[in-house]
């Protein structure tokens, strides 16, 4: 069914409804209209890295972990599996007349906000700090979820429009101030590009941007999203965000006024109950029936595109056996093996010899943690393999001991004994081992969405520091005193500085993110060399937090690899491998006013197969405005056997080669353009850490 056909059918159906019936369809738990043969429908479903909150499904690595693959094709495949499992569940729910929450086909994912500040707890849900990477991977995910068949397999939704990245504690009343340069260079591109890619939904954010609530923002919603970009899908509020318009933002005084200003600014669907006041707004002449009708038509267009009203429902032939099937589990493990970033590997300490490794201690709060595999907005797996489980499976000849050693934070309560000091147990275990794997990090009770948990380390899900919690830092440093061979496996959804002592002492450091249900096996396979890490950082790891701007400051100056002041500890785009790649024969293949095509030969000059993430960056200056140090503008994941060479071609959209003026206009830079291609960004720190410089081309 084409979009135009769906629009016509939606218009015809909505024309048969009364005003009250139309209003009943503008809320997430839309009512049935039996006289028209319309079933109830709940729009709220989650699928960021698996079909969430509705029984068993594949739990993929979280979004920030997926981002570390720099691999649009893999992300698209994951999106396709998510919608396949979503269809299986939907078919069963319809069969048994279950139309409850988390049972529909409208997934409110991906989160394409920019991870501008590493303290933000929801950064784990994003594709990182870069506009190009977020645009490219977000579009790939959407393509996978929605498919390219006659009907959408599921509906994806880009969120949270548009300038939104904390703080969690004040998000319901916070005003994010962003100038037009930052809006159009950083905060808006991922939304623009996913609209171009055909995303069917957009979710508005809780906060205000430049004074207006995002879910009732005349400029962002009407002028930019609907006007400039021509978006004709549906807009949904974040859950409870319309209540904030009158209760927290005090933008209007009454519930009816909040409902009216949101609908007038093209927010079609309310996740919440504020639109229960639309009938009052209508009777007070704050809105017209046409306003209500247009919103209802957009929503039914989506339902028609999903095939809800077809006599034979599309995708009804997907067998139930495909849910959590062998193929999906294999993909999940492959993804989990490609997400971790090898930050340090002193003297090629890894991989370990799994046949001769004798005594291995696994110490830390994430040794046996399932929640550190999941992250937030997670599905529920039929099987979880923790770090300890994975190492036991792989290192079958080793004597393995496991000790928690510490809670995530000092203030975290144990299940039955209140506060408990376990550090001495961790030290004793490490002291008896030949190798200690420190399984450190966080979970979504510490960093996440508006957790309501406040202590010295976290504020409602946002970190207060970029270091580990004090109890884990104390454990790690004590382990360093008793064990020479320490490997750090860090599991969290953000950037963390491990501190000078641990960073210097550790033989190897792996940032494993929230790696999904099979993350522990993936980590063990990497430790043993069964898998070769190839992930790249989708965020900057800063040296502590001393030079970070204020969390509430939405200016990009001093933020991310594009505007950092000073050197990063580990730069965006960086990540080591167990093999080495060589780049040569770089050239510009073609250039016109739309695209630039560049190519390079990439050779695996090591003795292990691996995936290289080829990255292209632009550097340009313009006398009219501030420009980034570098801007990622192309990526491609390439698998290479030992000794194998491939010619890799990247097509670069000129969009990413333009400077953004203070008025938000993209213009040709007047200072020239340099292109760099390699396995990292072309900064001095990356060059030093990897031992080579990127290839340079003048455009």
Where are the regions a protein language model picked out?
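Glycoside hydrolase catalytic-domain context in secreted enzymes
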Residues: 1-663, 668-681
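Short beta-strand elements
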Residues: 684-699
